[in-house]
């Protein structure tokens, strides 16, 4: 099918919303997600069928092709016919490697269905579970694709009965997860059932795949598969590919089981739209109305060397056209759309307009960032947005970068800025004291890939320090009240600190509790779910990004209102760099009990208020068993039984602990936790000790206290690295 015809067909079909499907492919790393995407593209005539699987059309960054993993979520619109009717399928490829899960979470918001790819031999892995859980939370309907079925014949040498058993086990495991994570009314409706056809078995690499209904129709069964792989001759495999082509099996299932945008938005908008569901914007979105006001959610920002910033996202309501005036809800800024287009592989094809229910690429939104909500400017006073996406992990590894050639400094700064626009999980900071540029990511791989992108895309060669793990400071006990005085002694703050309980930390981290919510609603949630006193919870005046809260327990303090903003800023600055090692503070409740404030504004500026607030908080922290928290990673390791001892030895050398171990057949599955600081050489150690026979996945687990036996050591090392005095701070240092 010639491509020019396709892009015209795609554009005309987009107007009929019942013929549109928005899907993504999600999976654990290396289970064959991008190869699956390629087969779907090849069938649409976007890549030639001969090179699909080699081409990795969606892996268009050279980093991805070298490493063979997908880093960016790429978009493409496909054309597919079922029973003579044409459909548009917007396909979004998402990364399966844990270091990039921020991108997965973002892509899910704009999908209505997902193809979950699982390797037939490895089965359901941690990352499969994480992405499936996230997609069910976003009300995205799953279809299952069990890939690499050829491995059951070639490597495990199973017969037809055993093969079916192995495949049924995977289906059972996926249904188990749907049962745990899907909402009650969707559990049964969305369960995977082979006889209905919402599961496809096949091999993406060899281009064949079938659902049970399709196999019955075409007279194919598992015996044919075993025969095809039992000879060295490829002809039988090619016959399979022409009898049951993978793209037909998957896309037929997508069209049958994934809802169109009109049906999907009815039940997805109430879940993902944070705002009044009765106003005009929400009503128009619930119906995916192309004639309503424009509402679009931006999921991805890319820097195109020729076109500038390209924003990609889904139009939930209205029709977006060049010249549309829109309002960015998060940036609080008006913008004008210059150009709209659809994706075909990595290329953008211009369009005159893109109606609700479709994925669009938009030029002209210089101020937009991933996660932005964009609405018709005439409706900017109607409040509401797609909730702040909560990503699954937070940046835990930092490196300092400087250009190899000092002349490249401005080029590097510009490149870092662009990278952080494209990837919100990458944090770029400047260390004011040393002038270093710090880059923080989700794990060693994330940071490594970002450096490679600097070199490939922006031509900047950088010198880096070894990766540094990020810590947090916290407390373990309740402190007494401390007085913090301003340098001029005219302002005093009386403050105590105590640790937040785990439930509160969880509610803030997952976005249930937010600083800007109604205080009564917040207090009710904290009382019912986290054992707070209702009256105390109502007095929360700040929650910062590192999960600390500030409570104003004062009554009738004169002039406090007037300096409130300055005091809050002082609190936030203190929370960014704690007393032990200048690392961010996490999980602390700060209570302001009383204050004395000078009546003359000249004597109560930031230079007086900041140190007073900070000193009281730091003194209180040092008296309440302060500690460092380190990031832990969850490991999910599959390894033959005979290597279990070697794996546990590697883990215990790295301060890891085994949480659970199960066995199926001759393979053990070990769930463990290990500090990120110890995981640097983990890959080579695990491979070395198991002769390369261990598969594993990692994922951010939680922050946990550094063991007391090494605490002082760790603190002193960080202080030395930051050029701070070698001795630990004392309470007296902060009391004047």
UniProtKB/Swiss-Prot annotation:
NCBIfam families: aEF-2 (TIGR00490), small_GTP (TIGR00231). Its main location: cytoplasm. This is Elongation factor 2. It comes from Metallosphaera sedula (strain ATCC 51363 / DSM 5348 / JCM 9185 / NBRC 15509 / TH2). Residues 18-262 form the tr-type G domain. GTP binds at residues 27-34, 93-97, 147-150. GO terms for cellular component: cytosol; ribonucleoprotein complex. The lineage of its organism: Archaea, Thermoproteota, Thermoprotei, Sulfolobales, Sulfolobaceae. Disulfide bonds: none annotated. The modification Diphthamide is found at residue 603. InterPro entries: EFG_II, EFG_III/V, EFG_V-like, EFTu-like_2, G_TR_CS, P-loop_NTPase, Ribosomal_Su5_D2-typ_SF, Ribsml_uS5_D2-typ_fold_subgr. It is found in: Cytoplasm.
């Amino acid at each position: 099918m010639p491509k020019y015809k396709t892009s015209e067909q795609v554009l005309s079909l987009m107007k009929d919303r019942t013929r549109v499907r928005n899907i993504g492919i999600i999976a654990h790393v290396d289970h064959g997600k991008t190869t699956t995407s390629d087969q779907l593209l090849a069938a649409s005539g976007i890549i030639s069928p001969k090179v699909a699987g080699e081409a990795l059309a969606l892996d268009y960054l050279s980093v991805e092709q070298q490493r063979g993993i997908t880093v960016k979520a790429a978009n493409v619109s496909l054309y597919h016919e079922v029973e003579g009717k044409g459909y548009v399928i917007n396909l979004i490829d998402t990364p399966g490697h844990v270091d990039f899960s921020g991108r997965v979470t973002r892509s899910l918001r704009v999908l209505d269905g997902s193809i979950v790819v699982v390797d037939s031999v490895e089965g359901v892995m941690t990352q499969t579970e994480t992405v499936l859980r996230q997609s069910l939370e976003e009300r995205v309907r799953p279809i299952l694709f069990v890939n690499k079925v050829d491995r059951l014949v070639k490597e495990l040498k199973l017969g037809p009965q055993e093969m079916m058993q192995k495949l049924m086990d995977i289906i059972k495991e996926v249904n188990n997860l749907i049962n745990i994570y899907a909402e009650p009314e969707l559990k049964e409706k969305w369960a995977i059932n082979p006889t209905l056809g919402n599961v496809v078995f096949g091999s993406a690499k060899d281009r064949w795949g079938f659902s049970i209904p399709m196999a019955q129709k075409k007279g194919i069964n598992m015996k044919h598969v075993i025969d095809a792989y039992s000879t060295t001759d490829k002809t039988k495999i090619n016959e399979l590919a022409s009898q049951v082509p993978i793209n037909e099996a998957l896309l037929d299932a997508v069209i049958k089981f994934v809802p169109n945008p009109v049906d999907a938005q009815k039940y997805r908008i109430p879940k993902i739209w944070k705002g009044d569901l009765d106003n005009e914007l929400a009503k128009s979105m619930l119906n995916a109305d192309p004639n309503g006001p424009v509402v679009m959610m931006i999921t991805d920002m890319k820097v195109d060397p020729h076109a500038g910033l390209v924003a990609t996202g889904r139009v939930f309501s209205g029709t977006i056209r060049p010249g549309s005036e829109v309002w960015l809800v998060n940036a609080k800024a008006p913008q004008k759309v210059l150009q709209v287009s659809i994706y075909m592989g990595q290329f953008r094809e211009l369009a005159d307009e893109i109606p609700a229910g479709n994925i669009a690429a938009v030029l002209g939104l210089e101020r937009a960032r991933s996660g932005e909500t964009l609405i018709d400017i005439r409706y900017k006073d109607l409040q509401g947005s797609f909730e702040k996406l909560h990503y699954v992990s937070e940046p835990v590894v930092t490196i300092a970068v400087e250009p190899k050639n000092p002349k490249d400094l401005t080029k590097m700064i510009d490149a870092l800025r662009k990278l952080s626009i494209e990837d919100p999980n990458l944090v770029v900071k400047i260390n004011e004291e040393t002038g270093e540029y710090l880059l923080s990511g989700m794990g060693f791989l994330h940071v490594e890939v970002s450096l490679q992108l600097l070199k490939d895309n922006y031509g900047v060669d950088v010198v880096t320090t070894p990766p540094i793990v990020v810590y947090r400071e916290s407390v373990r006990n309740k402190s007494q009240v401390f007085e913090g005085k301003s340098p001029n002694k005219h302002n005093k703050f009386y403050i105590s600190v105590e640790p937040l309980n785990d439930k509160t930390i969880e509610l803030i981290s997952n976005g249930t509790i937010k600083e800007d919510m109604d205080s009564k609603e917040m207090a009710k949630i904290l009382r019912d779910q986290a054992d707070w006193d209702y009256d105390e919870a109502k007095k929360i005046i700040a929650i910062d990004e590192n999960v600390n809260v500030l409570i104003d327990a004062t009554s009738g303090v004169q002039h406090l209102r007037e300096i409130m903003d300055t005091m809050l800023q002082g609190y936030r600055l203190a929370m960014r760099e704690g007393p032990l090692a200048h690392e961010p503070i996490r999980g602390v409740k700060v209570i302001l009990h009383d204050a004395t404030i000078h009546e003359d504004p000249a004597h109560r500026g930031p230079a007086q208020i900041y140190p007073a607030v900070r000193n009281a908080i730091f003194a209180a922290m040092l008296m309440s068993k302060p500690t460092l928290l380190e990031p832990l990673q969850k490991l999910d390791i599959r390894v033959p039984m005979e290597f279990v001892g070697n794996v546990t030895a590697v883990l215990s050398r790295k301060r890891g602990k085994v949480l659970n171990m199960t066995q199926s057949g001759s393979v053990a599955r070990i769930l463990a936790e290990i500090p990120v600081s110890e995981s640097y050489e983990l890959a080579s150690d695990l491979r070395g000790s198991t002769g390369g026979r261990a598969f594993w996945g990692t994922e951010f687990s939680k922050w946990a206290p550094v063991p007391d036996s090494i605490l002082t050591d760790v603190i002193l090392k960080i202080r030395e690295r930051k050029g701070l005095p070698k001795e630990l701070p004392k309470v007296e240092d902060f009391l004047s």
